[in-house]
């Protein structure tokens, strides 16, 4: 018996009046994930398009793969590089991850396999916990509301896992995604009704609730007892000269062979996925362009002003682009169609606001050397107001033409 025949055979148990009626959302989620939904439009459609919500979300999910696979390799590479330089640290490692890695691979930074297995041992448990715990909340709320479970959580789960440091405790991952899904999305009605990005909401919760595991120099490398600063932290301490003197070139930062959150280090891998999203019109090119313009404008202004006490005033825009979470946030977070502005003019304003805010937070606020998360969440809060003024201005303009 094939999968399709099996699903058809048990379907009546999950329909209204069936033995497992309350679990219909779970059955429907599995059915629509594996196969195209059987529902069709019976009357004339107002809009005809070749892409639906399922295809859109799966496309976004697939577009994260370049950043995800590179992130796993880089997580392992950074750890194995430290082991090669400090054998005493390798001898001091212990725990289930270390035992698992030792059973399937070695610790050679020049080995693609060793690096990938090392990184996978950290990323895959984070992703699994995110998917299981977040999926539980999605199914629970869908069952209570008698709604379907849509594919939006595929995107939320992978985005959240990719913006975390590899060393984060798994119980904090579960707590963070629970907050993001329940408080950031479900209490507002679920997919399509949230005004904050759920993945960023989850990360913000962890950032403020457990700062020791989300920031600092000890969380970015999967090696117990080692502390390594990110390029942005080095820039904050001594400017671009400090970054370069530490051995990090602009190309290193662009390719992604640096410390950082699992999926945020490689601007190149992120742009590969972003090109597909923009080309398929899933991501708004207006928002992406607006973010770049806002960032370039303010960073250039700070370069011209200069500062003797703040070295980040001198950071050029092309360095802002490749360090921290700027590229990942611009491509995958700012373009979220639910929490971003919906009007064309509003998308420009929304994007520019993010670009300006991220540089402002990075350069002027000494408490947060990284500002992309807060910049996007702030813009999410402003998005309804931006659209309101754009729509009102359009109404006034059209009325004026008819006077």
Swiss-Prot record:
A biological process term (GO) from this entry: sodium ion transport
Disulphides: none
Its membrane topology: Multi-pass membrane protein
Main location: membrane
EC category name: translocase
Keywords assigned: Cell inner membrane, Cell membrane, Flavoprotein, FMN, Ion transport, Membrane, NAD, Phosphoprotein, Sodium, Sodium transport, Translocase, Transmembrane, Transmembrane helix, Transport, Ubiquinone
Pfam families reported in the protein's UniProt record: NQR2_RnfD_RnfE
Membrane-spanning parts: 56-76, 121-141, 163-183, 220-240, 258-278, 287-307, 312-332, 348-368, 371-391
Signal peptide bounds: none
A molecular-function term among this protein's GO annotations: FMN binding
UniProt KW Cell inner membrane keyword: yes
Residues recorded as bearing FMN phosphoryl threonine in the entry: 230
Quaternary state and interactors: Composed of six subunits; NqrA, NqrB, NqrC, NqrD, NqrE and NqrF.
Role, per record: NQR complex catalyzes the reduction of ubiquinone-1 to ubiquinol by two successive reactions, coupled with the transport of Na(+) ions from the cytoplasm to the periplasm. NqrA to NqrE are probably involved in the second step, the conversion of ubisemiquinone to ubiquinol.
Protein name stated in the entry: Na(+)-translocating NADH-quinone reductase subunit B
Naturally occurring in which organism (per UniProt): Stutzerimonas stutzeri (strain A1501)
Gene: nqrB
């Amino acid at each position: 018996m094939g999968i399709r025949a099996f699903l058809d055979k048990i379907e009546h148990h999950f329909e209204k009046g069936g033995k497992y009626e309350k679990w219909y959302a779970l059955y429907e989620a599995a059915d629509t994930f594996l196969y195209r939904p059987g529902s069709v439009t019976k009357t004339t459609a107002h809009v005809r398009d070749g892409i639906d919500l399922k295809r859109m979300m799966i496309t976004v999910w697939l577009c994260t793969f370049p950043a995800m696979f590179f992130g796993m390799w880089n997580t392992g590479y950074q750890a194995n590089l430290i082991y090669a330089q400090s054998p005493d640290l390798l001898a001091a490692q212990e725990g289930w991850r270390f035992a698992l890695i030792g059973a399937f691979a070695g610790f050679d930074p020049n080995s693609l396999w060793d690096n990938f297995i090392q990184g996978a041992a950290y990323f895959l448990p984070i992703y699994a916990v995110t998917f299981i715990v977040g999926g539980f909340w999605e199914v629970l709320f869908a069952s209570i509301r008698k709604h379907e479970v849509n594919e939006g959580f595929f995107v939320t789960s992978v985005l959240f896992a990719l913006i975390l440091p590899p060393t984060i405790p798994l119980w904090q991952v579960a707590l963070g995604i629970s907050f993001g899904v329940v408080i950031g999305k479900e209490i507002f009605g679920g997919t399509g009704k949230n005004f904050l990005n759920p993945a960023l909401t989850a990360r913000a919760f962890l950032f403020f609730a457990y700062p020791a595991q989300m920031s600092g120099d000890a969380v970015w490398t999967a090696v117990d007892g080692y502390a390594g600063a990110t390029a942005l932290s080095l820039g904050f301490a001594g400017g671009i000269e400090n970054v370069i003197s530490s051995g990090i070139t602009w190309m290193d930062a662009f390719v992604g062979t640096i410390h950082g959150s699992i999926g945020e280090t490689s601007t190149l891998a992120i742009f590969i996925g972003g090109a597909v999203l923009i080309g398929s019109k899933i991501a708004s090119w207006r928002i992406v362009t607006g973010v770049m313009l806002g960032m370039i404008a303010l960073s250039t202004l700070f370069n011209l002003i200069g500062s003797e006490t703040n070295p980040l005033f001198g950071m050029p825009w092309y360095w802002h682009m490749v360090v921290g979470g700027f590229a990942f946030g611009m491509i995958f977070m700012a373009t979220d169609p639910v929490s971003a502005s919906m009007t064309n003019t509003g998308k420009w304003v929304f994007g520019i606001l993010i670009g300006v805010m991220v540089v402002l937070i990075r350069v002027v606020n000494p408490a947060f050397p990284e500002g992309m998360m807060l910049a996007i969440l702030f813009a999410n809060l402003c998005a309804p107001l931006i659209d309101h003024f754009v729509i009102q201005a359009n109404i006034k303009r059209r009325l004026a033409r008819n006077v």
